[in-house]
Swiss-Prot record:
GO molecular function: double-stranded RNA binding; metal ion binding; ribonuclease III activity; rRNA binding
Ranges where the RNase III domain occurs: 11-133
Superkingdom in the source lineage: Bacteria
Organism of derivation: Neisseria meningitidis serogroup C (strain 8013)
Top-level EC class as recorded in UniProt: hydrolase
Name by which UniProt lists this protein: Ribonuclease 3
Length: 239
Protein backbone atom coordinates (compact mmCIF):
# COMPACT_ATOMS: atom_id res chain seq x y z
CA UNK A 1 0.00 0.00 0.00
CA UNK A 2 2.82 2.37 0.93
CA UNK A 3 4.61 1.58 -2.35
CA UNK A 4 1.45 2.45 -4.29
CA UNK A 5 1.22 5.83 -2.59
CA UNK A 6 4.90 6.54 -3.28
CA UNK A 7 4.45 5.59 -6.94
CA UNK A 8 1.41 7.88 -7.23
CA UNK A 9 3.43 10.74 -5.76
CA UNK A 10 6.30 10.03 -8.15
CA UNK A 11 3.93 9.93 -11.13
CA UNK A 12 2.35 13.22 -10.09
CA UNK A 13 5.80 14.84 -9.89
CA UNK A 14 6.81 13.43 -13.28
CA UNK A 15 3.65 14.79 -14.91
CA UNK A 16 4.36 18.22 -13.46
CA UNK A 17 7.85 18.21 -14.94
CA UNK A 18 6.55 16.93 -18.27
CA UNK A 19 4.10 19.82 -18.30
CA UNK A 20 1.28 17.40 -19.06
CA UNK A 21 -1.41 15.71 -16.94
CA UNK A 22 -2.60 12.32 -18.17
CA UNK A 23 -6.31 11.64 -18.52
CA UNK A 24 -5.60 7.90 -18.70
CA UNK A 25 -2.93 7.33 -16.06
CA UNK A 26 -2.53 3.70 -17.15
CA UNK A 27 -0.68 4.96 -20.24
CA UNK A 28 1.91 6.68 -18.05
CA UNK A 29 2.23 3.55 -15.93
CA UNK A 30 2.87 1.42 -19.00
CA UNK A 31 5.44 3.92 -20.27
CA UNK A 32 7.27 3.49 -16.96
CA UNK A 33 7.08 -0.31 -16.91
CA UNK A 34 10.22 -2.25 -17.83
CA UNK A 35 9.87 -5.63 -19.51
CA UNK A 36 11.34 -7.32 -16.43
CA UNK A 37 8.19 -6.43 -14.48
CA UNK A 38 6.17 -9.10 -16.32
CA UNK A 39 3.29 -6.76 -17.09
CA UNK A 40 2.35 -4.58 -20.04
CA UNK A 41 5.73 -3.02 -20.67
CA UNK A 42 7.00 0.00 -22.58
CA UNK A 43 9.03 -1.44 -25.48
CA UNK A 44 6.41 -0.77 -28.18
CA UNK A 45 5.88 2.70 -26.74
CA UNK A 46 9.61 3.37 -27.17
CA UNK A 47 9.29 2.72 -30.91
CA UNK A 48 6.74 5.51 -31.32
CA UNK A 49 8.36 7.84 -28.81
CA UNK A 50 11.72 7.63 -30.56
CA UNK A 51 10.15 8.88 -33.79
CA UNK A 52 8.32 11.72 -32.04
CA UNK A 53 11.52 12.78 -30.30
CA UNK A 54 13.70 12.67 -33.40
CA UNK A 55 11.22 14.60 -35.54
CA UNK A 56 10.61 17.28 -32.92
CA UNK A 57 14.27 17.94 -32.13
CA UNK A 58 15.08 17.87 -35.86
CA UNK A 59 12.45 20.54 -36.48
CA UNK A 60 13.67 22.63 -33.54
CA UNK A 61 17.23 22.56 -34.88
CA UNK A 62 16.06 23.21 -38.45
CA UNK A 63 14.37 26.41 -37.28
CA UNK A 64 17.14 27.45 -34.88
CA UNK A 65 20.11 26.94 -37.23
CA UNK A 66 19.07 28.01 -40.77
CA UNK A 67 22.66 28.05 -42.06
CA UNK A 68 23.67 24.51 -41.06
CA UNK A 69 23.80 21.75 -43.67
CA UNK A 70 21.85 18.49 -43.44
CA UNK A 71 24.93 16.65 -42.19
CA UNK A 72 25.67 19.31 -39.57
CA UNK A 73 22.07 19.26 -38.35
CA UNK A 74 22.17 15.46 -38.11
CA UNK A 75 25.31 15.56 -35.98
CA UNK A 76 23.87 18.26 -33.76
CA UNK A 77 20.69 16.23 -33.27
CA UNK A 78 22.79 13.17 -32.41
CA UNK A 79 24.48 15.20 -29.68
CA UNK A 80 21.08 16.02 -28.16
CA UNK A 81 19.08 12.85 -28.83
CA UNK A 82 21.01 10.02 -27.26
CA UNK A 83 20.96 7.73 -24.25
CA UNK A 84 23.18 9.99 -22.16
CA UNK A 85 21.07 13.13 -22.58
CA UNK A 86 17.78 11.28 -22.08
CA UNK A 87 19.08 9.53 -18.96
CA UNK A 88 20.33 12.85 -17.59
CA UNK A 89 16.92 14.39 -18.25
CA UNK A 90 15.18 11.44 -16.59
CA UNK A 91 17.41 11.81 -13.53
CA UNK A 92 16.52 15.51 -13.30
CA UNK A 93 12.84 14.51 -13.34
CA UNK A 94 13.33 11.65 -10.83
CA UNK A 95 11.81 9.23 -13.34
CA UNK A 96 13.55 6.33 -11.58
CA UNK A 97 11.21 6.79 -8.60
CA UNK A 98 8.22 6.04 -10.80
CA UNK A 99 9.55 3.00 -12.66
CA UNK A 100 8.08 -0.49 -12.40
CA UNK A 101 10.92 -3.02 -12.47
CA UNK A 102 11.26 -6.74 -11.93
CA UNK A 103 12.91 -7.94 -8.73
CA UNK A 104 16.24 -8.61 -10.45
CA UNK A 105 16.43 -5.18 -12.09
CA UNK A 106 15.34 -3.49 -8.89
CA UNK A 107 18.03 -5.26 -6.89
CA UNK A 108 20.74 -4.42 -9.44
CA UNK A 109 19.86 -0.72 -9.45
CA UNK A 110 17.88 -0.67 -12.68
CA UNK A 111 16.15 2.54 -11.62
CA UNK A 112 19.53 4.26 -12.17
CA UNK A 113 20.49 2.41 -15.36
CA UNK A 114 20.89 4.94 -18.22
CA UNK A 115 19.38 2.67 -20.88
CA UNK A 116 16.25 2.02 -18.79
CA UNK A 117 15.82 5.71 -17.97
CA UNK A 118 16.31 6.76 -21.60
CA UNK A 119 13.80 4.17 -22.81
CA UNK A 120 11.25 5.39 -20.28
CA UNK A 121 11.61 8.96 -21.55
CA UNK A 122 10.91 7.89 -25.12
CA UNK A 123 7.99 5.75 -23.97
CA UNK A 124 6.46 8.71 -22.13
CA UNK A 125 6.49 10.81 -25.29
CA UNK A 126 4.51 8.06 -26.99
CA UNK A 127 2.14 7.81 -24.03
CA UNK A 128 1.35 11.52 -24.30
CA UNK A 129 0.55 11.11 -28.00
CA UNK A 130 -1.78 8.19 -27.21
CA UNK A 131 -3.47 10.08 -24.39
CA UNK A 132 -3.84 13.27 -26.43
CA UNK A 133 -2.29 13.61 -29.90
CA UNK A 134 0.99 14.11 -31.76
CA UNK A 135 0.95 17.90 -31.40
CA UNK A 136 0.67 17.63 -27.63
CA UNK A 137 3.55 15.15 -27.50
CA UNK A 138 5.58 17.52 -29.66
CA UNK A 139 4.89 20.35 -27.20
CA UNK A 140 6.15 18.18 -24.33
CA UNK A 141 9.40 17.43 -26.19
CA UNK A 142 9.83 21.11 -27.05
CA UNK A 143 9.26 22.05 -23.42
CA UNK A 144 11.93 19.61 -22.22
CA UNK A 145 14.50 20.33 -24.93
CA UNK A 146 14.08 24.10 -25.31
CA UNK A 147 17.04 25.05 -23.10
CA UNK A 148 19.29 22.35 -24.56
CA UNK A 149 18.58 23.51 -28.10
CA UNK A 150 19.20 27.14 -27.13
CA UNK A 151 22.55 26.14 -25.62
CA UNK A 152 23.50 23.94 -28.56
CA UNK A 153 26.71 25.03 -30.26
CA UNK A 154 27.52 23.20 -33.45
CA UNK A 155 31.19 24.19 -33.38
CA UNK A 156 31.66 22.43 -30.04
CA UNK A 157 29.74 19.27 -30.88
CA UNK A 158 32.04 16.38 -31.64
CA UNK A 159 30.84 14.03 -34.35
CA UNK A 160 29.85 10.63 -33.09
CA UNK A 161 32.35 7.94 -34.06
CA UNK A 162 30.21 6.10 -36.61
CA UNK A 163 29.22 9.29 -38.44
CA UNK A 164 32.79 10.57 -38.53
CA UNK A 165 34.08 7.23 -39.86
CA UNK A 166 31.38 7.06 -42.51
CA UNK A 167 32.18 10.58 -43.74
CA UNK A 168 35.93 9.88 -43.72
CA UNK A 169 35.45 6.73 -45.83
CA UNK A 170 33.13 8.49 -48.26
CA UNK A 171 35.62 11.33 -48.66
CA UNK A 172 38.21 8.74 -49.68
CA UNK A 173 35.71 6.88 -51.90
CA UNK A 174 35.71 3.65 -49.91
CA UNK A 175 32.76 1.44 -48.99
CA UNK A 176 31.00 1.86 -45.66
CA UNK A 177 32.21 -0.22 -42.70
CA UNK A 178 30.55 -3.40 -41.51
CA UNK A 179 29.82 -3.95 -37.83
CA UNK A 180 29.33 -7.39 -36.31
CA UNK A 181 28.68 -8.73 -32.82
CA UNK A 182 31.64 -10.97 -32.04
CA UNK A 183 30.69 -11.80 -28.48
CA UNK A 184 28.10 -10.99 -25.84
CA UNK A 185 29.35 -11.49 -22.30
CA UNK A 186 27.06 -11.76 -19.31
CA UNK A 187 23.31 -11.79 -18.91
CA UNK A 188 20.74 -9.69 -20.77
CA UNK A 189 20.47 -7.05 -18.06
CA UNK A 190 24.19 -6.79 -17.45
CA UNK A 191 25.85 -7.53 -20.78
CA UNK A 192 29.15 -6.56 -22.34
CA UNK A 193 29.26 -6.50 -26.14
CA UNK A 194 32.33 -7.08 -28.29
CA UNK A 195 31.85 -5.53 -31.73
CA UNK A 196 34.11 -5.70 -34.78
CA UNK A 197 34.40 -2.95 -37.37
CA UNK A 198 35.55 -4.17 -40.79
CA UNK A 199 36.81 -1.67 -43.39
CA UNK A 200 36.56 -4.21 -46.19
CA UNK A 201 38.99 -3.61 -49.05
CA UNK A 202 41.28 -1.61 -46.77
CA UNK A 203 42.02 -4.83 -44.90
CA UNK A 204 41.57 -3.38 -41.43
CA UNK A 205 39.43 -4.91 -38.69
CA UNK A 206 39.28 -3.75 -35.08
CA UNK A 207 37.28 -4.72 -32.01
CA UNK A 208 35.85 -2.76 -29.11
CA UNK A 209 33.77 -3.41 -26.01
CA UNK A 210 30.75 -1.60 -24.64
CA UNK A 211 27.86 -2.05 -22.23
CA UNK A 212 25.48 -1.83 -25.21
CA UNK A 213 25.77 -2.69 -28.87
CA UNK A 214 25.59 0.98 -29.84
CA UNK A 215 28.31 1.99 -27.39
CA UNK A 216 30.63 -0.77 -28.60
CA UNK A 217 30.03 0.18 -32.24
CA UNK A 218 30.94 3.79 -31.46
CA UNK A 219 34.18 2.75 -29.80
CA UNK A 220 35.09 0.44 -32.68
CA UNK A 221 34.35 3.22 -35.17
CA UNK A 222 36.65 5.61 -33.31
CA UNK A 223 39.49 3.07 -33.42
CA UNK A 224 38.94 2.50 -37.14
CA UNK A 225 38.84 6.25 -37.81
CA UNK A 226 42.11 6.76 -35.96
CA UNK A 227 43.76 4.08 -38.11
CA UNK A 228 42.29 5.48 -41.32
CA UNK A 229 43.45 9.03 -40.66
CA UNK A 230 46.96 7.83 -39.80
CA UNK A 231 47.31 5.57 -42.84
CA UNK A 232 45.40 7.61 -45.42
CA UNK A 233 45.37 11.27 -44.40
CA UNK A 234 43.42 13.57 -46.70
CA UNK A 235 45.50 16.16 -48.52
CA UNK A 236 44.49 19.72 -47.75
CA UNK A 237 43.49 21.80 -50.73
CA UNK A 238 45.79 24.72 -51.43
CA UNK A 239 44.17 28.12 -51.07
Amino acid sequence: MKDDVLKQQAHAAIQKKLGYAFRDISLLRQALTHRSHHAKHNERFEFVGDSILNYTVARMLFDAFPKLTEGELSRLRASLVNEGVLAEMAAEMNVGDGLYLGAGELKSGGFRRPSILADAMEAMFAAVSFDADFNTAEKVVRHLFADRVRRADFQNQAKDGKTALQEALQARRFALPKYRIEEQIGYANDSMFVISCDLGELGFVCRAKGTSRKAAEQEAAKEALKWLEEKLPLKRKKK
